[in-house]
From Swiss-Prot:
UniProt feature, compositional bias: Low complexity: 95-104, 567-591
Top-level taxon: Eukaryota
Protein name, per record: Knob-associated histidine-rich protein
Function: KAHRP might mimick human histidine-rich glycoproteins to anchor host thrombospondin or a parasite analog in a binding complex with the endothelial cell receptor.
Keywords of this entry: Glycoprotein, Malaria, Repeat, Secreted, Signal
Primary residence: secreted
Organism: Plasmodium falciparum (isolate FCR-3 / Gambia)
Compositionally biased spans, kind Basic residues: 57-87, 108-117, 406-422, 625-634
Amino acid sequence: MKSFKNKNTLRRKKAFPVFTKILLVSFLVWVLKCSNNCNNGNGSGDSFDFRNKRTLAQKQHEHHHHHHHQHQHQHQAPHQAHHHHHHGEVNHQAPQVHQQVHGQDQAHHHHHHHHHQLQPQQLQGTVANPPSNEPVVKTQVFREARPGGGFKAYEEKYESKHYKLKENVVDGKKDCDEKYEAANYAFSEECPYTVNDYSQENGPNIFALRKRFPLGMNDEDEEGKEALAIKDKLPGGLDEYQNQLYGICNETCTTCGPAAIDYVPADAPNGYAYGGSAHDGSHGNLRGHGNKGSEGYGYEAPYNPGFNGAPGSNGMQNYVPPHGAGYSAPYGVPHGAAHGSRYSSFSSVNKYGKHGDEKHHSSKKHEGNDGEGEKKKKSKKHKDHDGEKKKSKKHKDNEDAESVKSKKHKSHDCEKKKSKKHKDNEDAESVKSKKSVKEKGEKHNGKKPCSKKTNEENKNKEKTNNLKSDGSKAHEKKENETKNTAGENKKVDSTSADNKSTNAATPGAKDKTQGGKTDKTGASTNAATNKGQCAAEGATKGATKEASTSKEATKEASTSKGATKEASTTEGATKGASTTAGSTTGATTGANAVQSKDGTADKNAANNGEQVMSRGQAQLQEAGKKKKKRGCCG
């Protein structure tokens, strides 16, 4: 007490206002009365509540200011003998109260000072503080403590689920389950690699894990060392890895399904590399774990297609839920924090659970992409982050018409492409071809960009969805057009655009070019929509930004092409391009963005369907090569 008193005395020399004292005393008296009468029906109601409040305040103060409590209680003792009983020491100090109050006044002042500040509030409604003798647990602390505990609990849950689900496993899925259970995968889901899109809580988010720990399955690495490196890195058994890699999973897991093996656009309708409807589950998700996966999971390793095996439509995509599903954000890695919040630890986003996911959603878009917003800005600069770049451009154009200057490369490229597209549909075609070649080359050469694109695209998709939706589209459009007019960095843009397009898995980029080029307005719209995703990307972005707008612009573009949507689809330009581009880069951005933005799974589906051809073809060509290397699952 004295040490505290001294401390307080030293700390607080202000005389405690008499008014405050009076208020406190009166309040305490009232409380005391209440305590006496509380049992009686009379004062039980409000009096009781205030009493609790007071007690609460005191208790809280006790926890936080133990010495203060004692002072306080001493001060209050005369009036609150009962109260003091809680605080034994103070009980007998009632007589001393005045002395101590004065002697301790400074201390009291400290305490009472707080107390009175609190008290009026308390009188008004300290209720905010739950009555408790224990210190109030801070939510942050709880959360901080939670990740480790959560993980452990999660494992427990996981184990229980493991057995439960084992019992509940559908017959068709039992094989996989048993197989992996034997391996201690304990994935209650159909297959260890298949997690319910909608409930990511069922098991470790393998996609998230894989994205976090790519196992060397990144596009860049895939071409050369893919199988071996991945196998070496694979946490699980080699057999399983091989199954996924080589498509054995197709045999073992229905989820892995031929889609996993077939890199054919038909299976790719999901838009392997980038697109894929959220539920397409096509390999498109392999690359991005479905766009959802990339979006949701870590943008980092959007392509762990192998693991997902993009099993059919379930595998990857089911595994990687769209935004909400996975770590979803957290995982920058799984998009849905829902996915594996536990694993969110792997993905920065989900560290704390699904909200990481939210963050990830934010993060996904932003965090996953190094802060999408910034990244976009950066992306514009780093157009090399294809998706990011393109999208950035789109977004950025949306977000930063000014950034567009950064984007100028891209925007101009887009504009350029647009100009080309507008001016020269065939030029755009050439650009497309070039892009195709370039993109293919880049895609293969710079698979990572593609994958990055997938990731970023996914992220960007969301962003694009969000941003593109923005009125900035118009601004972007203007910016792009202006830039187009300015023609700044057009060369750079072409390269950037090509790279971006390439990164975008340029089927879409090509398409984008066409789509964009066909209709300058459409392209501009797309481009503007795309925000300087170069018209091609613009188409894609248009698709993303405005699945409908892109489609329309794209449609127009395709019409301009003299092709209908099918033509676009065939070309993978215009709508298909948007979709394809969206599927590819835009597609991922566009298609997914369309999904996310427009929430038009249908558009995506439609786009995917249409895109599948162009996107699937282009992407399959570009991404398919990688994927084929990956094998059905990866």
